[in-house]
Amino acid sequence: MEHYGILVSLLLATVLPQGSPFKIEVVEYEDKVFVNCNTSIRHLDGSVERWLTKNKSLILGKGILDPRGMYMCNGTEELAKEVSTVQVYYRMCQNCVELDSATLAGVIITDLIATLLLALGVYCFAGHETGRLSGAVDTQVLLKNEQLYQPLRDRDDAQYSRLGGNWPRNKRS
């Protein structure tokens, strides 16, 4: 008999509905997030865009704007002390930027300004070198005589064999 009592209590525990007489639902419809409760809902903390249907439903806002908050569903008249809470935390993207026409125009204008400043800097730096003579003057200083190339001595076929071998050097002490 004792086993039947345990079996009946287990059967009743599984068959009878367990849980509270009210429920909180977080629903995403189109691009907005809703919090619904079959009794009255109370906003504890966070974002609320608009209340609907006599404090039973509220719109938190667009899902992409990361709505979040703490919401409590109150009990019925029979179970006034029972409450159920839910914490909503949406995190759609961490570093997202909404790309509208103003943002795109700002990026393009900033890119053009940066490119123009870079071109101006290169022009100012490379265009006006001070303290240097022109290339033609450097060539004239390097070539003292009229001859462009010196002939090799003794016409030896070995490459670089006698090139500058016994020439006098200017040694400074």
From Swiss-Prot:
Name this polypeptide is given: T-cell surface glycoprotein CD3 delta chain
Location of Phosphotyrosine modifications: Y149, Y160
This protein's GO CC annotations: alpha-beta T cell receptor complex; external side of plasma membrane; plasma membrane; T cell receptor complex
Every ITAM domain range: 138-166
Residue ranges crossing the lipid bilayer per the database entry: 107-127
Organism annotation: Rattus norvegicus (Rat)
SS bond list: C37-C73
Record carries keyword Transmembrane: yes
Topology within the bilayer: Single-pass type I membrane protein
Gene of this entry: Cd3d
